[in-house]
Swiss-Prot record:
Located on the platform of the 30S subunit, it bridges several disparate RNA helices of the 16S rRNA. Forms part of the Shine-Dalgarno cleft in the 70S ribosome. It comes from Bacillus anthracis. Belongs to the universal ribosomal protein uS11 family. GO terms for molecular function: rRNA binding; structural constituent of ribosome. This is Small ribosomal subunit protein uS11. Keywords: Ribonucleoprotein, Ribosomal protein, RNA-binding, rRNA-binding.
């Protein structure tokens, strides 16, 4: 029986000018996803995916690196302008936005979509260190 040659599909270059950057910044990690205007993902990155572990994962520097990697990958698809939606209370919020601008993407709007409870679940107890 003949062996199949292992051919990888080449990634299709989409030609998308405008998109949305979804930044999810928690106390433990920062995830950056760049999508087109319909919400189809072009690229994503996170502090954990870049090899940051433990307490270094939640730093602004890790968020900056995640945003840079996602931006470079999305710019290969022709992305130029962005709307930014930020969710969560983490340390990497501003750093990720600044990194997207520094990568050469034009930020047109910044929207905070952090979910705020109308007195829903009881929050976790206070830490005593």
């Amino acid at each position: 029986m003949a062996r199949k040659t292992n051919t990888r599909k080449k990634r299709v270059k989409k030609n998308i000018e405008a998109g949305v950057a979804h930044i999810r910044s928690t106390f433990n990690n920062t995830i950056v996803t760049l999508t087109d205007t319909h919400g189809n993902a072009l690229s994503w990155s996170s502090a954990g995916a870049l090899g940051f572990r433990g307490s270094r994962k939640s730093t602004p520097f890790a968020a900056q690196m995640a945003a840079e990697t996602a931006a470079k990958a999305a710019m290969e698809h022709g992305l130029k302008t962005l709307e930014v939606t930020v969710k969560g209370p983490g340390a990497g919020r501003e750093a990720a936005i600044r990194a997207l601008q520094a990568a050469g993407l034009e930020v047109t709007a910044i929207r905070d979509v952090t979910p705020v409870p109308h007195n829903g679940c009881r929050p976790p107890k206070r830490r005593r260190v």
